[in-house]
Amino acid sequence: MSIFGSILSLQDAINRFPQFEYQINRLEKEQKDTEAASRASFRKHFVRQCQELHRQLDDHRNRIEKAKTDETYKKENALEQLDKLKQRLTALSPEKEQLSFSVSVDSQSEEEKPKMAAIGRRKSTMYNDDESEDSDNDSEIIETDVQLDDPLPSQPQPPQQQHQQPQPKPRQPITITKPLESKTLNERQELDEVISRLQNPSRGDSGEVMEPVVVRGNVFVAIDSWDAEAEGDLELIKGKKYRITQTRSDGWWTALDEYGQRGLVPKTYLQHVKEKPKNVPSKVSSRLGVRDSVIGISTTTDPSRREANRQASRVDDCLGKAYDNDTHLSLVCHMAPRLSTSNIGFHDLFWSHYKDQVYKRTVHISKIIRLVRFEKMPLIEHKALVRMALVDITNPKSTQIVSNVHTLVPRVKSSTWYFEKKESQTRSCIEFSDFVLRSNYRSPTVVLVVEASHLVKTQIGIEEKSLGHTYLRLIIDDKAVPSRTNVLYLDDEVMTKMKLPEASKRRVLVQVMDVPKDKVSYVDSLPDVIVFNALYLPFFHFYRRRAGTILIRDNRNPLSAEFISDPLLSVFPFVCDQHDIMDIMLKIWKTKKKVLAKKNEAEQTAEFFQTFLHTAFFIHGIRMISYDVKDDLTLSIRQQTMQRFVDALNKGLFKQFIADQQCKPINIIDYSLDLLGNHSID
């Protein structure tokens, strides 16, 4: 062996130390299980594991001693570390040389005892002790008949009749005697070979071994009650669910009930339960396409929302909390184009080269919805909110949000909530009653949910509470909902239990309207599923036109993976949910309406891009408090910060925009889209 090879051998031996330490830590954890240590069969298996690890450490020590290297100190340190591991292992299992021991209570002498090894209840080889016993429905249970004597051909059992009482196999007595020392090694090798052959049966011995039965999940239900017969058994109650942590070849399994009690139960009293996974992937959020590039801006700039996303197990009782916990429910996702499965074209964005505009896409539902008013609402102390979204109510107990969440702030007058019906210079756009609804779902179970909520003070701060919700059906008799005024009734758990008459319920007046003819081309250029403020319609159309121009018309190489740097495509979807920034854009845009009326669509798109750069893009880069529609103080501070720059822009005082402190260069990646990342496939 060369010197270079010896150094490699020593280094390889040192690299195995973490593996040995992990195995010893696992054995120390097993030793703390006092219940397992009280059973002789468990203890025997534990001792066998320690002995096997002892043998591996001895072999490893010989390998280190034989290694030739000039780094003597490294070899000494390795041997010293190995000795420490052996000391820990010896402390765990003093029975180093003892391979088995007797648990028989018979008074016969050792010479008269039969030399046999018949195990009545043997520890399952399908579950390792280091696996978590508390995992629910995420493991496999493999039941295999293990026979230490000559295996017999498995006899097919007749199917059990429903009227017959299920009976377990009779218990076999535990009689494990100590074999002769000379046969110990051979018996252990034979046992390991038998277990290995049973766990991994080959084609040649398939006739001798019963095929394993594999099921997904370890949750079973008791089909009948069963009383414990001996110490260590667990009582079964009909209809109760139990978690199986260990299996046996004789049919006696280790079960865990809902109170944490553990014991042996007969498998014939159990029936497997196929439970649904805890976290069902969202139909919307699992396929976001290019929108995930835009999400990166929000997840890095808003720590509170990023922290909320980690609380996946939290159940949201209103749309507001769902919106705060999931960025996928905002316009930052639904506005950006979505790549198709080919990773070349787009799912909902097409360009007409003949007309030089975005190709129109007709969907099943394309309406203007107006919230007229809410009646007979309870008196509230703080701010009121109205949230809307498309939801799938196929499963009433677990509705699925399939669009973004749109928010309105009503004007509360006693028990009636009003909304702004016309565009106003003094009112905010978040109070405007009309919103555009586009949906390409054909299923009648996809409906529009309208939820009323209010803010209440709690010990941890301001919290949003629901006052009830109602559903507006969008597909009626396989046709789109007709244009009319609908009277809906808010409902919640308390009102449902009270069974109030309709005359005393909280009413919602919702008016459904067709899209005006001069706005149809704008609406048809938008994504297939979206809900947004009707005042934003020109902005959204120009955004989609610029996206089609850059991503399709002017893109010479659709296979290119280069980042597309464009401030409008990357930043505008993020500011769409911030109504205070959108208010500024709307006011400036309104002053240009007369001039814009004389320009074509391409020129209007260019003008919108300049307006965006001078307002939303610039304001978005200002260091100020994060947007929160629920906090009026936050909105007031943001308004004061932005108004100072807007006034300077209107007066032409551009000197105020010059930075008076040290600044960092702009990171172009923050204003770019990664179209061909692994997250972009639809």
Swiss-Prot record:
Classification via SMART domains: SH3
Gene Ontology process terms (BP): determination of adult lifespan; neuronal signal transduction; non-motile cilium assembly; protein localization; protein localization involved in establishment of planar polarity; response to hermaphrodite contact; turning behavior involved in mating
Annotated Acidic residues bias: 128-148
Keywords: Behavior, Cilium biogenesis/degradation, Coiled coil, SH3 domain
UniProt KW Cell wall biogenesis/degradation keyword: no
Tissue specificity annotation: Expressed in ciliated sensory neurons of the head (amphid neurons) and the tail in hermaphrodites (phasmid neurons) and males (sensory ray neurons).
Coiled coil: 10-100
Region feature Disordered, mapped onto this chain: 96-188
Matching InterPro entries: NPHP1, SH3-like_dom_sf, SH3_domain
GO cellular component, one term: non-motile cilium
Keyword Manganese set for record: no
Residue pairs linked by disulfide bridges in the UniProt entry: none
Gene knockout outcome: Impaired male mating behavior.
Lineage: superkingdom: Eukaryota
Domain SH3: 215-275
Pfam families: SH3_1
PANTHER family: NEPHROCYSTIN, NEPHROCYSTIN-1
Function: Plays a role in the extension of dendrites from phasmid ciliated sensory neurons. May be necessary for initial assembly of the cilium.
Family indicated by similarity: Belongs to the nephrocystin-1 family.
Name this protein carries in UniProt: Nephrocystin-1-like protein
Encoding gene per record: nphp-1
